[in-house]
């Protein structure tokens, strides 16, 4: 199939690019647009094959913008192959070209630069470098100011929203999701951007504990699920599983995590399967099925590789293994896992809350009720703090939404 498409596109290139230079360039633009339309969904699922096709086509192009447009998409393929150094290197070539030729075809340069910085932001997110990701994504949005069309702007706003969600800044997260929704409405684009926006808003409201609103957005997104890539379906299934985990509907959570697990079978990066296997392991602990829990936790640890040694992640996984040990009444192992020394500024307060609850359970099982009470009080204190923070985030998100809605109202007037 790949060789047929290369031959077919080569034929189109010969037909479309013969004649005067302007006709040749128009033909190249049509060729590249056709190529990207054909391989849009294959970049994630067959990235190496797509690199071969794009590279073969680039070698015959005369227009530099078309050349670097394909190269920009190749950088995404390296990301999907989990070759992050190569993804950054190729992405850097595209950005350098755009910045050196800023006065050329300004509109096309802006669109390409916006796409390149959007890719770079996603790469930084993958590495957990959120400050660098935010900087790149804001550069992407700035690059598209005045560009026509701005079809990638909703995607940039979704990525910005996701960055702020990871930072725990839910007000700015909600702001950018709603900006993405406004842009999608104004551009009149297809279902895919709406799916990402609705899924993201569902995750946001799950984090805020507003489960009715979260469920509403999940249902909106689910109606569009068939039109999306495997990665987008994975994100939806894993997020839906987390929703049911938070509402304590563990059988439903298990169903959705298993769906996510099946989707990751075709992914070249082990990270996604590692995440969902961690979720499956924790869910089986809550369902009091220790053998299944151990299977998935052990496999998650294997799949995470070097990431397992990062303090924040190790603290989280040690906590899950401690829960498993408590379930099996292996109190010495549970105590050893819960007694590790970590720098608290590197640890999510939610995980500290869970570990204090585990310590309370441990000492209750040991008959040391005084210590069990002390750890219960510490857990309650963190829980109160987290609840207050959630309320503040909810109020801030409502305030942002209100200000956006009233701004639109004034424009309509």
Q: Where are the regions a protein language model picked out?
A:
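Hydrophobic positions within repeat-based interaction scaffolds
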Residues: 27, 31-33, 48, 85-88, ...
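Flexible helix-coil transition and linker loops at the boundaries of alpha-helical arrays
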Residues: 57-66, 97-110, 144-150, 184-191, ...
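Bacterial Sec-dependent N-terminal signal peptides
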Residues: 1-42, 64, 74, 98, ...
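Conserved alpha-helical positions within TPR/SEL1-like repeat arrays
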Residues: 39-40, 72-80, 111-126, 151-166, ...
